């Protein structure tokens, strides 16, 4: 029986599980949206929510506690300057877990874990990627046109 055995083991030993969750939480705070398995998303949710609550406090002690958990200083800066102010009047529930299908190898259920209110930033990132893709496509078409023009200028049979 699993009475009073809360939490997720994730098939790992303690240090590996702790490292995995710290990395996942850091990625969520840096990227706003991460795809992972549903179990890992559910395991990471309370950690992210506690860190956002620390970020809302905003004092030095909270910053040091966040720095002790997160992997990078950039993540701490982003947490306190960008992420936490979004949720000033909200008491918890900062994340959304959206199921996204199944993993190919082992059939594990995948999910996106994302911060609420990050839709605008995610749309901007998506639009920027689309513009970069379009620019690359235009450059490729231009290069192909130049190449065809160069090939078209030469005699096809050569000098025989």
Swiss-Prot record:
Biased composition (Low complexity): 142-152
Keyword Ribonucleoprotein in record: yes
Composition bias type Basic and acidic residues, residue spans: 123-141
One Pfam family per UniProt: Ribosomal_L17
Disulfide bond sites: none
Molecular function terms from GO: structural constituent of ribosome
Keywords of this entry: Ribonucleoprotein, Ribosomal protein
GO biological process, alphabetically ordered: translation
Assembly description: Part of the 50S ribosomal subunit. Contacts protein L32.
Stated family: Belongs to the bacterial ribosomal protein bL17 family.
Name of the molecule in the record: Large ribosomal subunit protein bL17
